[in-house]
Amino acid sequence: MAKVVTMGEIMLRLSPPGYQRFAQASEFEINYGGAEANVAVSLAQLGHDVTYISKIPSNAIGEAAIATLKKTGVDCRDIARAVRQSDKENGASVRPSSVVYDRADSSITQASAEEFDFDQIFDGAELFHVSGITPVLSEETARLTRIALQKAKEHGVTTSFDLNYRTKLWTEDITGKQKLLSDLMSYVDICFGNTRDAAKCLGYAEKDKNFIDGDYSICVDEKHMENVRERYGFT
């Protein structure tokens, strides 16, 4: 089995039980997760040797998050100490689910690349996975992601990047964030996403009504994502 490294933010999610609204709830269900943490857990459960990189506060909630990952077999020794939370309200009938993010000034947004020994972390690793969520959280996470990708390439590690567009995290400086992610693509071997992700995260679009309007049929996705692959040189 492969040695895999993932990096991102793990959050505490509070969900009202059943289909209650936040205003109706007097208690909440607790879950820990995040895009890259979920990948780490899934791969660990498949038997891979998985290391998760993040930064969390030094308190009981942070330790509970780490314990949750460890129970699934994820190696957490390289997590820096310093969970933020996202709150999810389940939809009912025609009412959609609602998510409230509380990520401002979270631990990872203040993480420095110097807090992680990437030479040791990537020693013997075969795959490094990160998502488009992490670099757009702050200037610090943008630098952290760039250095992590650079170090992974120096060690001959295959790099994997999930564009993972999130509307609520892309409310300011859209052009700047698109340039940031586009620049990071030079370090990426494998990229996950669809035409919407490419348009929103990379600023990539073609003069095609189906593309711009978001017709994500297999043939449309295949055509445009092949063009994206060629443009950025993905494997």
Spans of model-derived segments:
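Alpha-helix C-terminal capping segments
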Residues: 38-49
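Hydrophobic beta-strand scaffold residues
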Residues: 50, 76, 159-161, 192
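Positively charged, low-complexity intrinsically disordered leader regions
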Residues: 1-21
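Conserved phosphate/ATP/ADP-binding segment of small-molecule kinases
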Residues: 169-235
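Conserved N-terminal subdomain of the carbohydrate kinase-like
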Residues: 49-132
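A short helix->loop->beta-strand "cap" motif at the edges of active sites that frequently abuts
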Residues: 151-158, 230-235
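Short pre-catalytic strand/loop immediately N-terminal to key active-site residues, enriched for Gly-Thr
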Residues: 23-33
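Catalytic-core regions built around general acid/base machinery
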Residues: 143-156, 179-187
